[in-house]
């Protein structure tokens, strides 16, 4: 995420053994600190099943199968106010119903997490996984964004790589954060524009920057979709992005993939934001 880091969010997952790991997230209904992305404080919560959890907690984290759904209002200090969500704890569908006006500042990343990130781990995850052992990673995702033409947001995957297998459980990374922006408004990339690339049927603007938080540095690589924005992808080939990042020197074969997140970097407006269905397959 732009100048932000993670939370703990995700959804129900089915583990299938065999030649690879498949983690499809069940279809889910469409209704419902100061250190960025650390997911600061608060253990994952087990709620009564088959209920809608309404929460305005800064770092709400609800386990759903092998995923976690998180609020991750990581930059509340820069954007005082309240963020509220309605989460279906049986399916993982969620809606962000309230969020303050934060201007140009990324303040929150309500998302789904599979893997480990900043000390939060989804139950039963197969990550971290060596990049060298990955054949394919695909994902399907459906979401909805409301608001008006002046709102600012980006809906994106946030995918994390690290030279060792403990980054996600021990805090800040020192590898690469790879974002895939599927839908955004009144925002752009930052630092260095590397050009464009065609991947999985779309053209993407590629941006790179360096993140530095609490003495920890890592690469930030963003792929921003050109042309019409989308609100769903089906079997998006994430490995195509991994390979492109590797060709640019930002992912190493000896590193580990340790987290896949999908959410909305909230700034101003864009509500209601709904996450409707999500799945990941790793082989």
Describe the residue ranges of each PLM region.
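Long, compositionally biased interface segments
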Residues: 218-283
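Sequence contexts marking disulfide-bonded cysteines in secreted/extracellular proteins
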Residues: 18-20, 55-57, 78-85, 101-103, ...
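Solvent-exposed N-terminal domain segments of exported/luminal and surface proteins
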Residues: 42-102
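Short helix-loop boundary/capping segments
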Residues: 165-237
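Ser/Thr-rich, Pro/Gly/Ala-heavy low-complexity intrinsically disordered linkers and tails
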Residues: 19-42
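Bacterial N-terminal signal peptides
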Residues: 8-18
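N-terminal secretory signal peptides that target proteins for export/translocation
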Residues: 1-5
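Extracellular-facing segments of soluble proteins and assemblies that are Gly/Ser/Thr-biased and enriched
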Residues: 108-196
């Amino acid at each position: 995420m732009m100048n932000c880091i993670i939370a703990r969010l995700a959804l129900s997952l089915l583990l299938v053994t065999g030649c690879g790991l498949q983690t499809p997230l069940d279809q889910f209904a469409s209704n419902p600190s100061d250190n960025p992305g650390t997911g600061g404080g608060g253990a994952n919560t087990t709620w009564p099943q088959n209920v809608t959890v309404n929460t305005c907690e800064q770092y709400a984290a609800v386990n759903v199968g092998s995923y976690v759904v998180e609020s991750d209002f990581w930059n509340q200090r820069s954007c005082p106010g309240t963020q509220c969500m309605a989460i279906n704890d049986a399916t993982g569908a969620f809606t962000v119903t309230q969020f303050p006006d934060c201007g140009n500042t990324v303040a929150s990343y309500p998302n789904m997490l599979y893997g480990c990130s900043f000390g939060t781990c989804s139950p039963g995850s197969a990550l971290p996984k060596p990049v060298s052992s990955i054949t394919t990673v695909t994902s399907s995702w459906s979401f909805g964004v409301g608001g008006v033409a002046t709102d600012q947001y980006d809906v994106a995957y946030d995918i994390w790589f690290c030279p060792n297998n403990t980054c996600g459980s021990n805090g800040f990374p020192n590898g690469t954060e790879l974002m895939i922006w599927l839908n955004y408004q009144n925002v752009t990339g930052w630092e260095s524009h590397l050009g464009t690339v065609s991947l999985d049927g779309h053209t993407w603007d590629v941006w790179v920057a360096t993140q530095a938080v609490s003495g920890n540095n890592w690469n930030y690589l963003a792929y921003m979709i050109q042309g019409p924005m989308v609100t769903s992808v089906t079997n998006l080939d994430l490995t195509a992005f991994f390979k492109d990042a590797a060709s640019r020197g930002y992912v190493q074969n000896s590193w580990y993939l340790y987290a896949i997140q999908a959410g909305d970097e909230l700034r101003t407006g864009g509500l209601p934001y709904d996450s409707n269905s999500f799945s990941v397959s790793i082989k």
